[in-house]
Amino acid sequence: MEDPVQLKEEGNKYFQSNEYGQAIQCYSKALKLITDKKMQAVLYRNRSACYLKQDNYVQAAADASKAIDVDASDIKALFRRCQALEKLGKLDQAYKDVQRCATLEPKNRTFLETLHRLGTNIQEKLHVQFSTDSRVHKMFEILLDKNSEKEKREKAANNLIVLGREDAGAEQIFQNNGVNLLMQLIESKDPEMILSAIRTLSGMCTGHRARATAIVHLVGINKICSIMAVDNEEIALAACNLLQNIVDSLTGEDKKAHGKQEALVLDTKKDLKIITTHLLDMLVSKKVSGHGRDQALNLLNKNIPRYDLKNKDNSKSLFVVDAGLKKILKVLGQVPELPNCLPLTPNTRLNASVLVNKLYDDLRCDPERDNFRIICEEYITGSFDPKDMEKNLHAIQTVSGILQGPFDLGNKLLSLQGVMEMMVALTGSENEVDQLVAVEALIHASTKLSRASFIITNGVSLLKDIYKKTKNEKIKIRALVGLCKLGSAGGTDYALRQFAEGSTDKLAKQCRKWLCNPSLDIQTRKWAVEGLAYLTLDADVKDEFVEDEQSLKAMFELSKTSDKTILYSVATTLVNCTNSYDVKEVIPEMVQLAKFSKQHVPEQHPKDKKDFVEKRVKRLLKADVISALSCMVKADNSILTDQTKEQLSRVFLALCEDPKDRGIIVAQGGGKAMIPLALEGTDVGKIKASHGLAKIAAVSNPDIAFPGERVYEVVRPLVSLLNTERDGIQNFEALLALTNLSGKNDKLRQKIIKEKALPEIENYMFENHEQIRQAATECMCNLALNKEVKERFMAEGNDRLKLIILLCGEEDEVKLQRAAAGTLAMLTGAEKKLCHKMTEVTTQWMEILQRLCLSEDLQVQHRGVVIAYNLINADKELAKKLVESEMLEILTVIGKQADVPNKQHIINAAREALVKCLDYGFIKTVS
């Protein structure tokens, strides 16, 4: 059995060596073994000191209290409890403890200083508290007095919002019956007062779980949702923000440290489930405004699916699928033109599609996905009714909405009996609403070639008739987009054109005509861009489009409007125009094999060849495409999806292809715009944007391309391109870019090292590809100026220096030899230790050095002579080795040459080396 006294001594030793965790373990073990009260008090006091050091103030105060219970005059325990209580904000209790300490030891300066400090702090706190109390009362008096001046009420309302955001102010409002008074403001029916009350409640709920829980129960979820349901965008948004803050506080997502009182809060899962249920009920309630429905969808989108798929708990999504998927589908199926439609905004159905997509992506296994599909199938088939056309429209509109979300699921639903047939049948209807719904559904359904072929066979003539005959612009533009999408169903395959030669050109002209017509509403012009997004897969169309500068500028202007849902269509059009989509590599042998087996072989359009693409890129740059792209990158994250970011990254990379164009891109802010694309989005998008940054950073002045602190943000994307899974060209251009950056300053070199680029750069110095090996060595040459890199070369047990010396001997690759010799010159000039190490790591060092000094390339020769000087300057023994070899003769020949401008720096370096030898007394001047 262990001895408690020995355990105490061990604990003391651990405490003195700052190993507080080990000390706590020893004291805790000793406490279990001992019954003597005085000894227990000492152990509690010691453990309290450990907890103080670990910033665990609650436990420190508890242990000190246990020691004081045994001996009320234990001065150490009293002071430790005082320190802990002060940190916990309990100043009055801390003051009492230090007052007792000062009574016991009146001359102790530490106690007296603490007593004075705490006294001052308590006075300040009381002053703030009383002033806050009076301010809160005064504000509520003004707000609740209907006779108060409007200006006074607005000022009081704003002050209340500010107070609600401060912890002390929020607590004072809460303690002074503030929640009930705020509810009176909400009941006043004055929009300004309602907004102020909601925003104040929102501030009070932020970062405080106990207060948030109390407010939920005092106000009620039902009441908050009814406020969010009103037809006022600002109030709906404020109520949404209030609910979001409540959810964040209940789940701990606010990332704030919670105090001791948080332990009293009961399990919050029940409250969160009630909130989710109320939000789902809001989706199908006719009493809820379009803005309220949008905010309910936004809250579900943000809080239900998992952010991190590594977290295996998707129970929230499963609950919503079971309890509310049909309600979400009801929103998807709404037709705004019908009289009994729920109140909607232009974005409501799109938000619902996003939610369906996120829920479907959040499912973890096939049974969960099957359940999701079955619910959708039952809902759609249950909506079909031969006697009720409105129900049929609702079913088709639902399928259309799902096709805009989880497309794979939507495609399975298209296979249901009667769905495609119903779409085609509704297209032939004389009712404009039927046509509108059916045409839009056909557009979304014709993404897969097999579906497009069915529509071309059964419905294209109907679409043409609608396009020619209808006078309704909304239907006409949708019919046009439908024809555009069907016409592009063959993709870039020239042999799979769906329509006759010239048909797609006519469709494109009409799209451009609508796009350039400012009298048309944004929604119609948006559809025109969507049509072009499909048609520009045809090389003839994209060639004509980029020549039409008016259409390009109209599209760019449209992308800057408040309706950001157009961004994906614009980005896709630009991807098509620059040919920056993925193209499978054509292997000639496989083509021959396919022809032999009578399989279809894709054909490239003549205008998709490299020279045509380059001309299109030049025209886009001339039309100010970079400014438009920069504006698109700044769009709100909820609209700028990862897929859109990927498309923008592809376009930027294609625009950066020609080094001559990179100056224009930098001048128009393209370098800055690419940074966020390289840091966020899909893996493919980040790689493409990083590659674009590498192309810019490789040839541009970093101060101009990435001004200020932005240059440091570029390093991580560039380092990511050094991954061995990336292409050789990406590795090469990333190394060039890092070389350029590392030559700028040591802070940048330090950032490159911090991002763990050194091992990757060293790895590429062994690469078989000579250009990559050269780029890596050049990068190392610049990094060699950094202290940490020098230390890595000086460290024992590695061959870094040996590799550099051997690369200096690569006479067949002059650029590589220059880079390696430059690195060696830097290292030997900076550290004398490396001069000695150079002669030890390989026996070939002398031969390689002599070859450097005799090189025909002046840059290599200069580096060789500098290395020789560094060795001579470093140590007399090293100098002796060089003098005893043929090096002396080589340096003498170089030093005796007549002054020549292009070789003067080499001659001077050789002369300096000879002067040093003269100083050592190894050689004498000829009298």
Swiss-Prot record:
<dbReference type="GO" id="GO:0030154">
    <property type="term" value="P:cell differentiation"/>
</dbReference>
<dbReference type="InterPro" id="IPR011990">
    <property type="entry name" value="TPR-like_helical_dom_sf"/>
</dbReference>
<dbReference type="Pfam" id="PF11701">
    <property type="entry name" value="UNC45-central"/>
</dbReference>
<dbReference type="GO" id="GO:0030018">
    <property type="term" value="C:Z disc"/>
</dbReference>
<feature type="repeat" description="ARM 2">
    <location>
        <begin position="209"/>
        <end position="248"/>
    </location>
</feature>
<dbReference type="InterPro" id="IPR024660">
    <property type="entry name" value="UCS_central_dom"/>
</dbReference>
<dbReference type="GO" id="GO:0002088">
    <property type="term" value="P:lens development in camera-type eye"/>
</dbReference>
<dbReference type="InterPro" id="IPR011989">
    <property type="entry name" value="ARM-like"/>
</dbReference>
<feature type="repeat" description="TPR 2">
    <location>
        <begin position="41"/>
        <end position="74"/>
    </location>
</feature>
<dbReference type="GO" id="GO:0048471">
    <property type="term" value="C:perinuclear region of cytoplasm"/>
</dbReference>
<feature type="repeat" description="ARM 1">
    <location>
        <begin position="167"/>
        <end position="206"/>
    </location>
</feature>
<keyword id="KW-0221">Differentiation</keyword>
<dbReference type="GO" id="GO:0007517">
    <property type="term" value="P:muscle organ development"/>
</dbReference>
<keyword id="KW-0217">Developmental protein</keyword>
<feature type="repeat" description="TPR 3">
    <location>
        <begin position="76"/>
        <end position="108"/>
    </location>
</feature>
<dbReference type="InterPro" id="IPR000225">
    <property type="entry name" value="Armadillo"/>
</dbReference>
<dbReference type="InterPro" id="IPR016024">
    <property type="entry name" value="ARM-type_fold"/>
</dbReference>
<feature type="repeat" description="ARM 3">
    <location>
        <begin position="746"/>
        <end position="785"/>
    </location>
</feature>
<keyword id="KW-0677">Repeat</keyword>
<dbReference type="GO" id="GO:0031672">
    <property type="term" value="C:A band"/>
</dbReference>
<comment type="function">
    <text>Acts as a co-chaperone for HSP90 and is required for proper folding of the myosin motor domain. Plays a role in sarcomere formation during muscle cell development. Is necessary for normal early lens development.</text>
</comment>
<keyword id="KW-0517">Myogenesis</keyword>
<protein>
    <recommendedName>
        <fullName>Protein unc-45 homolog B</fullName>
    </recommendedName>
</protein>
<keyword id="KW-0143">Chaperone</keyword>
<dbReference type="GO" id="GO:0005829">
    <property type="term" value="C:cytosol"/>
</dbReference>
<keyword id="KW-0963">Cytoplasm</keyword>
<dbReference type="InterPro" id="IPR019734">
    <property type="entry name" value="TPR_rpt"/>
</dbReference>
<feature type="repeat" description="TPR 1">
    <location>
        <begin position="4"/>
        <end position="37"/>
    </location>
</feature>
<keyword id="KW-0802">TPR repeat</keyword>
